[in-house]
Amino acid sequence: MSAKKSPEELKGIFEKYAAKEGDPNQLSKEELKLLLQTEFPSLLKGPSTLDELFEELDKNGDGEVSFEEFQVLVKKISQ
């Protein structure tokens, strides 16, 4: 996936994966893993990378990643 996506496209991608289980407005760690493996495969170099990335993105510590938290990752990789 190209990092150059419109905000609407990014929101659609986020919602597609977030709706798989639990809260449709939040990504669980498994949903984030699936999204990254599919859309940004070069970001995941191993299991520790996912854990570190999830911890970094989950700013409020609720165990899930909101769209706002996800946007931090998108901004970081599009620079």
UniProtKB/Swiss-Prot annotation:
Residues 13-48, 45-79 form the EF-hand domain. The gene is S100G. It comes from Bos taurus. This is Protein S100-G. PANTHER family: PROTEIN S100-G, S100 CALCIUM-BINDING PROTEIN. InterPro entries: EF-hand-dom_pair, EF_Hand_1_Ca_BS, EF_hand_dom, S100/CaBP7/8-like_CS, S100_Ca-bd_sub. One of its GO terms (molecular function) is calcium ion binding. It comes from the Eukaryota. The keyword Repeat applies. PROSITE patterns: EF_HAND_1 (PS00018), EF_HAND_2 (PS50222), S100_CABP (PS00303). GO terms for cellular component: apical plasma membrane; basolateral plasma membrane; cytoplasm. Ca(2+) 2 binds at residues 58, 60, 62, 64, 69. Signal peptide: none annotated. It holds the Pfam family EF-hand_1. Ca(2+) 1 binds at residues 26, 31. The modification N-acetylserine is found at residue 2. The modification Phosphoserine is found at residue 42. Keywords: Acetylation, Calcium, Metal-binding, Phosphoprotein, Repeat, Vitamin D.
